[in-house]
Amino acid sequence: MSPLATKALRPAATDPASIRNFCIIAHIDHGKSTLADRMLQMTGVVDSRSMRAQYLDRMDIERERGITIKSQAVRMPWELDGQTYALNMIDTPGHVDFSYEVSRSLAACEGAILLVDAAQGIEAQTLANLYLALENDLTIIPVLNKIDLPAADPDKYAAELASLIGGDPSDVLRVSGKTGAGVEDLLDRVSRTIPAPVGDPDAAARAMIFDSVYDAYRGVVTYVRMIDGKLSPREKISMMSTRATHEILEIGVSSPEPTPSDGLGVGEVGYLITGVKDVRQSKVGDTVTTAARPATEALPGYTEPLPMVFSGLYPIDGSDYPDLRDALDKLKLSDAALVYEPETSVALGFGFRCGFLGLLHLEIITERLSREFGLDLITTAPSVIYEVTSEDKKTVTVTNPSEFPGGKIVSVSEPVVKAAILAPKDYVGTIMELCQSRRGILLGMEYLGEDRVEIRYTMPLGEIVFDFFDNLKSKTAGYASLDYEPAGSQDSDLVKVDILLQGEQVDAFSAIVHRDKAYAYGVLMTGRLRELIPRQQFEVPIQAAIGARIIARESIRAMRKDVLAKCYGGDITRKRKLLEKQKEGKKRMKMVGRVEVPQEAFIAALSGDTEKKAK
């Protein structure tokens, strides 16, 4: 057994040869945060008294959903064969929406632990992140977790892992994050096999930002990995992409609580605080250098994360609009991938059009807005970016159905993604059926073991963002996993379906759909609204239209007073007169009447709560 390190190495004075930078690649729920907890305990960084489950997941929402959203970096001491090592573990998110965060974290490491649940095997997102790691030339340590589970089948999955990355099944480590079995061997293996960082200590300082977090008291905390040179407190630094200069107020390492130090040297991972209040000043993936002696070229491999999914966020109470703006500004401080701009809707009032990396990102942002800022919001149906070319050869970029141009349209192009679905082989038929119904084109399939298949499709992103993932999970009893990456765009026969209430268009319900699906969408929405809008004193027609052509209609029957109640028996002409009079009144009402759509109806129609009833 490796003893605990008697004394930790001092940051800024650590020889790069004894530094090991690694990250853990795993799918959601494969036990990455629990394994990280055990490592923190075994290296003595966190004592057992202050230990809590998922120690590194700071946000409530991360702990509750059991997912990691922001990357964290922790420095841990470990002793092996008489030498003390400084292990820097960079915790990465496992979800497809945050693949940019993953790529930044991987770029800061030399090695990766590929963590797989011994009861479930490899999932699609783990594969995607593994390919990213291999592209970055990282040393991979395969590990099976949860071997204490009764359902675990380590031998089968060890063989699967070994065949995937090349190697011997006996090299696959078996650990249990829960009981701590095998974690020491894993730390020994990390110290032995992961290469030490390489850099020039005398060159101009260059550090890569792999995460930045907003702290309410200290401003932006920037996590960096030093490549060359060193940084010290009170030094003036400059960001290479924005050319902004700041002074380092504090620099140090997380262990896992922030610990100030005398600086950071080659290969070290730590944080710096400059007192800046805006995360956009320290972009993830940017290069930090000293202002006095700047580096000539920035580090490669950085891109701006582009939003893939757009949705409108509107406060239920219009007076909350300024609060929503402040809340989004604050979230933007800690989430550089979020983009938003103000927009107005006739039906919903003032709000923001926001761009997200994917559906989970959208869900997390809306949940954080309601949780951390106490806002009640309506979220419109998610949409993607369309390029619409009209007859006069003008091209319009549409992120919102209301921007879709009228008149003759030559072509509409939509983003396409390459999707990889991993599932047990029994479900291949149902998955193919689902993908074909979503306009997917089969690229190929591969058997990863004797009973697991990877199926690859190209699909329009617009078909995935709405409810594809939920359908996939329900059709495969939760076994399938999905990963997708952008793959350009394609021209499609897309139309805009408008929903009309009493002849007036309600912009919140408009959608851009494929012509073959337009009728189904029209029937679904009109049926849904018929259930939700309260009956009026007059009949209200709900119509779905493409341009001027009505494709579906439902009517909300009028409420009627029983005008014949006072006639006991009596002449039929008397009754007819009263009924005709009522009819006239209703007609007049219909001419001037306006339909108020209650807020609840908007929320329910947009979130699909009434699907059961509407059918």
Curated annotation (Swiss-Prot):
| Top-tier EC class | hydrolase
Q: Does the keyword Magnesium apply?
A: no
Keyword Ribosomal protein assigned to the entry: answer is no
Please provide, alphabetically and separated by semicolons, the GO molecular function terms listed in this UniProt record.
GTP binding; GTPase activity; ribosome binding; translation elongation factor activity
**SMART domains this protein is in?**
EFG_C
In this UniProt entry, which cysteines form S-S bonds? Answer: none
* Binding residues for GTP: D29, H30, G31, K32, S33, T34, N145, K146, I147, D148
Q: Which GO terms describe its cellular component?
A: plasma membrane
- Keywords, A to Z? Cell membrane, GTP-binding, Hydrolase, Membrane, Nucleotide-binding, Protein biosynthesis
Which Gene Ontology BP annotations are present?
A: positive regulation of translation
Q: Which reactions fall under this protein's catalytic activity?
A: GTP + H2O = GDP + phosphate + H(+)
| Coiled-coil boundaries | none
Name where it mostly resides: membrane
As given in the record, the signal peptide range reads none
| tr-type G domain sequence ranges | 17-198
For membrane topology, the record states: Peripheral membrane protein
EC number of this enzyme: 3.6.5.n1
By its UniProt entry, which Pfam families does this protein fall under? Answer: EFG_C, GTP_EFTU, GTP_EFTU_D2, LepA_C
Give the subcellular location.
Cell membrane
Matches recorded under NCBIfam families: lepA (TIGR01393), small_GTP (TIGR00231)
**Family that this chain belongs to:** Belongs to the TRAFAC class translation factor GTPase superfamily. Classic translation factor GTPase family. LepA subfamily.
- What does this gene product do? Required for accurate and efficient protein synthesis under certain stress conditions. May act as a fidelity factor of the translation reaction, by catalyzing a one-codon backward translocation of tRNAs on improperly translocated ribosomes. Back-translocation proceeds from a post-translocation (POST) complex to a pre-translocation (PRE) complex, thus giving elongation factor G a second chance to translocate the tRNAs correctly. Binds to ribosomes in a GTP-dependent manner.
What is the protein's name according to its record?
Elongation factor 4
Q: Which gene encodes it?
A: lepA
